[in-house]
């Protein structure tokens, strides 16, 4: 699966349920803020319960799909659109190569989630794919997604 980040949004990171067992070494658990929305996003795609997703805060990303995949969008209502047309939340959505996913401002909530049937190809660090920005580990290069990431 391939996605190109056209706009990173305010704070878009890769997250799962986080890493436990390393707090005594100074690492926070990290992980998703809204566990229910995270689990529903993965359930809709028949993914493993702890499969990594994109979590975004207040302003969602703009993503271009460079290959076909199936996604689900959960969490707050950020008025998602695919190619300029409203997209449904809390359902599986087939994305074609070249499709553009955008979000408006939040109508409800502060966080949204995008799960992928073809999984996010990021390394597992200490048992988790979650981004820990302070420690610069996990997720995509240990940081939030930025414009033009691929």
Where on the chain are the PLM-derived regions?
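Conserved "landmark" site that anchors the functional core of diverse proteins
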Residues: 1-150
